[in-house]
């Protein structure tokens, strides 16, 4: 990259940060906001406060450390206002490649040691693929096939935390934050997105959220369609049976229902088709799929006969059984390929999480409080938004941040806390 191009990028970064400054209130927050965002987009293995202070202010690292620490951990600015401004500035860059096609609900986890970081608990940690001590944040992202951006970010507070007044007080959890399940947090985010009129009329969920029939019903009540991953044991009415009433205890007459796995195994060979799809600019992928119109056997449907929806099944060649199942309320006349394309669009959120963690340090926050956790997440999303808006200047290989801004020197005297050489 030439000097002229680098200067242009620095100018656009400055204008971008000025947009964020316009919604944070006090003028004295402008410099730490700029420096925090700069630290996040600069190359570096660790994006916690201390190393970012050393990178952004080599001559006054200690003072910069205190400034950034106060800004992210105690600053009284609004996460909602900043995320709203990020959305306003970045959405045109995303829509340049096409309209917003969907909202994606998911969560991301952060392994932690100890028990004092807000919301930390022994729970399923997606990053590690097992039960572990971690924090979990629920997110809603807007997406098309070319780009995506998280627009809502909320820490899941386990029930043990929500009911522990001492830990709540120490982590400064707001009084109005009560225990909610992750699907309940997700539905709150979807209702918020619907109320403010975010573009997009389809919600994508993996099985961790899609299995929740209350969440699916809530999406339908908003007039939105969904493509929701579900579990193999999910019950549907047998195609040959007319759906009946839901018993008071929410149980179905077993002979009249079947699991989606058993239904998939009963399908004839002609029901399966090999179909290709793409994830971004990657090579074409292919697998075997079948789709069936079904009535879901759920106790959370509206009164009366449940509506039909699509059951989409993936059964790759060589596998002993189907590997993925989705329910979808997309129109009955949608093409097979378009239904698969919608289900597979969730790959964008995996890319988001990977880049948010690897490029801008989403998981690097070392504070313990509620405000700092969310402020750091907001700043990471803001930095990521800038990288999205600059995607046309980024070469096809190499880290985004390294391609955008030059490496700043870390002072020779800098030693991370805990280092044997630290004074």
Predicted features along the sequence, with ranges:
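A short, flexible helix-boundary coil/loop motif
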Residues: 1-29, 40, 157, 164, ...
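Short amphipathic alpha-helical "interface-anchor" segments enriched in bulky aromatics
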Residues: 105-109, 209, 256-257, 261-265, ...
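A short, structural micro-pattern
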Residues: 132-134, 220, 305-307, 319-320, ...
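Conserved, well-structured core segments
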Residues: 139, 328, 341, 381-383
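Catalytic-loop motifs flanking and including active-site residues across diverse enzymes
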Residues: 136, 348, 352, 375-381
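Charge-patterned, long linear interaction tracts outside catalytic cores
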Residues: 296-334, 347
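Generic structural signal for hydrophobic core residues of well-folded globular domains
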Residues: 40-44, 56, 72-75, 330, ...
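Conserved, well-structured functional cores that handle cations and Mg-NTP chemistry
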Residues: 2-204, 208-228, 232-235, 242, ...
């Amino acid at each position: 990259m030439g000097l002229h191009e680098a200067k242009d990028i620095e100018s656009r970064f400055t204008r971008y940060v000025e947009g964020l400054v316009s919604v944070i209130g006090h003028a004295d927050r402008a410099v730490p906001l700029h420096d925090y965002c700069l630290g996040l987009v600069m190359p570096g293995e660790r994006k916690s406060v201390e190393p970012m202070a050393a990178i952004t202010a080599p001559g006054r690292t200690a003072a910069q450390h205190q400034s950034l620490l106060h800004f992210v951990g105690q600053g009284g600015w609004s996460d909602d206002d900043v995320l709203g401004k990020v959305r306003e500035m970045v959405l045109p860059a995303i829509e340049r490649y096409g309209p917003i096609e969907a909202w994606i609900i998911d969560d991301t986890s952060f392994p932690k040691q100890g028990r004092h970081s807000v919301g930390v608990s022994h729970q399923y940690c997606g990053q590690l693929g097992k039960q572990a001590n971690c924090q979990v944040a629920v997110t809603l992202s807007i997406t098309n096939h070319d780009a995506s951006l998280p627009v809502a970010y909320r820490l899941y507070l386990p029930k043990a935390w929500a009911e522990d007044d001492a830990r709540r007080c120490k982590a400064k959890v707001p009084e109005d934050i009560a225990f909610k399940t992750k699907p309940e947090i997700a539905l709150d985010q979807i209702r918020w997105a619907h109320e403010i009129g975010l573009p997009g009329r389809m919600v994508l969920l993996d099985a961790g959220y899609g299995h929740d029939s209350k969440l699916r019903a809530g999406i339908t009540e908003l007039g939105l369609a969904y493509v929701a991953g579900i579990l193999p044991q999910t019950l549907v009415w047998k195609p040959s049976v007319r759906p009946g009433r839901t018993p008071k205890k929410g149980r179905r007459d077993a002979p009249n229902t079947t699991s989606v796995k058993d239904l998939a195994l009963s399908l004839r060979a002609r029901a399966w088709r090999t179909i290709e799809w793409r994830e971004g600019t990657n090579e074409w992928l292919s697998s075997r799929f079948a789709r069936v119109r079904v009535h879901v056997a759920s106790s959370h449907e509206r009164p009366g006969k449940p509506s039909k929806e699509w059951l989409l099944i993936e059964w790759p060649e060589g596998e002993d059984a189907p590997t993925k199942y989705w329910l979808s309320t997309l129109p009955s006349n949608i093409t097979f390929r378009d239904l698969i394309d919608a289900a597979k669009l969730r790959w964008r959120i995996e890319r988001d999480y990977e880049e948010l963690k690897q490029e801008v340090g989403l998981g690097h926050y070392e504070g313990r409080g509620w405000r700092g956790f969310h402020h750091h997440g907001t700043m990471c999303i803001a930095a990521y938004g800038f990288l999205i808006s600059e995607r046309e200047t980024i070469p096809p290989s190499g880290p985004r941040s390294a391609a955008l801004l030059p490496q700043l020197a870390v002072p020779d005297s800098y030693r991370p806390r805990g280092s044997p050489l630290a004074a």
